[in-house]
């Protein structure tokens, strides 16, 4: 009985978390396509190519991998050398 209650609470929590963290889909495709078309005409405009605010290896990043240039973060930015 306890396990069933725990499972129900866990599923409800995950469903609520999904709705809270979901993106707003109103006018999503309308706003997405003109931006993508602009990036196709000018590849330099792509946000994926820009890494201006990234930190080099050995700097503190917490647990947010987006701060590191290498995208590997475990408290500090990790850079692998081949």
UniProtKB/Swiss-Prot annotation:
Its main location: secreted. Disulfide bonds join 54-69, 61-73, 68-77. One of its GO terms (cellular component) is extracellular region. Expressed by the venom duct. Pfam families: Conotoxin. Residues 23-49 form a propeptide. GO terms for molecular function: sodium channel inhibitor activity; toxin activity. It is found in: Secreted. PROSITE patterns: DELTA_CONOTOXIN (PS60005). The keyword Disulfide bond applies. Keywords: Cleavage on pair of basic residues, Disulfide bond, Hydroxylation, Ion channel impairing toxin, Knottin, Neurotoxin, Presynaptic neurotoxin, Secreted, Signal, Toxin, Voltage-gated sodium channel impairing toxin. Residues 1-22 form the signal peptide. The modification 4-hydroxyproline is found at residue 65. Delta-conotoxins bind to site 6 of voltage-gated sodium channels (Nav) and inhibit the inactivation process. Belongs to the conotoxin O1 superfamily. The presence of a 'disulfide through disulfide knot' structurally defines this protein as a knottin. This is Delta-conotoxin-like SmVIA.
